[in-house]
From Swiss-Prot:
Protein name: GTP-binding nuclear protein Ran-2
Keyword vocabulary terms for this entry: GTP-binding, Nucleotide-binding, Nucleus, Protein transport, Transport
List of residues binding GTP: 21-28, 71, 125-128, 153-155
GO terms for MF: GTP binding; GTPase activity
Species the sequence originates in: Oryza sativa subsp. indica
Protein's GO biological process: protein import into nucleus; ribosomal subunit export from nucleus
């Protein structure tokens, strides 16, 4: 969904809305993609920056117009104009802040009120930080709502492409779609402990085999 002041492209393009509490790393995440950062447009009427992120797949190019709130979520909820015509979404929280995970259901509710039945990815960002407050096994919201979940680190580029690949497959209706070119990203700013992250991924897999808890109260006390 291009904005009026943006040229359209002759390959599939989709409006991707990115939501979550302020400070969770949404802007850092979209700015990793160098061409999207170069071509971004500011839309003052809604107060968003729109980053066109291109990916090359085995079925041709695909573009996500990533709508970034430019921090306005710190002053309350987002206007419906931000969500309208959204075709896919990323909800982001910060694994070093319990509160940002506690607020995920609110973001999900606001999103689904305007955008029904769109593919959504939940992302736990900042997994490069050692003292995470939200453990991998405590992340259960995606299972309750049938969302895809990825642990990411925007600053180290860890798992950067995974949310986009999942959404591209859903939007194309092709589970075998894959990216055929590496995306030009900014160099990593922080290292990531891959052994530790493999441990977290194993915890996630083990947790997925367990019955869902009745609520998330153990996480937010």
């Amino acid at each position: 969904m291009a904005l009026p002041n943006q040229g359209t492209v002759d390959y599939p393009s989709f409006k991707l809305v990115i939501v979550g509490d302020g400070g969770t790393g949404k802007t850092t995440f979209v700015k990793r993609h160098l061409t999207g950062e170069f071509e971004k447009k500011y839309e003052p009427t809604i107060g968003v920056e729109v980053h066109p992120l291109d990916f090359t797949t085995n079925c041709g190019k695909i573009r996500f117009y990533c709508w970034d709130t430019a921090g306005q979520e710190k002053f309350g909820g987002l206007r419906d104009g931000y969500y309208i015509h959204g075709q896919c979404a990323i909800i982001m929280f910060d694994v070093t802040s319990r509160l940002t995970y506690k607020n995920v259901p609110t973001w999900h509710r606001d999103l689904c009120r305007v955008c029904e039945n769109i593919p959504i990815v939940l992302c736990g960002n900042k997994v490069d930080v050692k003292n995470r407050q939200v453990k991998a096994k405590q992340v259960t919201f995606h299972r309750k709502k049938n969302l895809q979940y990825y642990e990411i680190s925007a600053k180290s580029n860890y798992n950067f492409e995974k949310p986009f690949l999942y959404l591209a497959r859903k939007l194309a209706g092709d589970p075998n779609l894959h990216f055929v070119e590496a995306v030009a990203l900014k160099p990593p700013e922080v290292p990531i402990d891959l052994a530790m992250q493999q441990q977290h991924e194993a915890e996630l897999a083990a947790a997925a085999a367990q019955p869902l808890p009745d609520d998330d109260d153990d996480l937010i006390e």
